[in-house]
Amino acid sequence: MRQLLLTLSLISVSASDATVKCDDLDPNQYLCKNYAVDTITQQSVTCAADNSIQVMCETAEHIKCVGKDQFGIFNRTVPSACHYGAHVSYTTTVLLSIFLGFFGIDRIYLGYYALGLIKMFSLGGLFVFWLVDIILISLQLLGPADGTAYAMAYYGPKAQMIRFDSHTNFSFYTCDGCL
């Protein structure tokens, strides 16, 4: 009886694994290799216009899925992994905001020409808008006017929005019993 149950479970597992697409596997069932980074743009070499990249991933030996080759390797598309149209330097923007922000040069550099002129003729909004812009730019809440991201070093200080989906694991930690 025990062998029959074991055989049935193995048959059902192997039959169901073969119909699963490799892109639909759980993150703990495959390992993706590091991708090449372009030294000029500080982005992935495979960065596409929709901000996704292609990475090569290898499944565990016992995983069967549709889309992998005989070596167990498949290409996976990772969404929102790069910034394709980034052309405004984050470092330059911060330095312009600190040293020339009261003249509105930072806003003009980002593409906000009208606000830059207002800051220029009001000396940074009597230095209030200047301080606000330093904070907004350093926290990356104020970006380029065309909607692209900042061009910054690959391991630079990137701030990104946290998005939750069906693959996100999060826990709540409390201090019950800490004392």
UniProtKB/Swiss-Prot annotation:
Glycosylation sites: 75, 169
Topological category with respect to the lipid bilayer: Multi-pass membrane protein
GO cellular component terms, semicolon-separated: membrane
Extracellular side: 19-82, 133-179
Signal peptide region: 1-18
Transmembrane as UniProt keyword: yes
Keyword Membrane carried by entry: yes
Domain of life: Eukaryota
Subcellular location(s) per record: Membrane
Keywords: Glycoprotein, Membrane, Signal, Transmembrane, Transmembrane helix
Cytoplasmic-side positions: 106-109
TM stretches of this protein: 83-105, 110-132
InterPro entries: TM2, TM2D1-3-like
Coiled coil: none
TM2 domain boundaries: 88-135
Entry similarity comment: Belongs to the TM2 family.
Name by which UniProt lists this protein: TM2 domain-containing protein Y66D12A.21
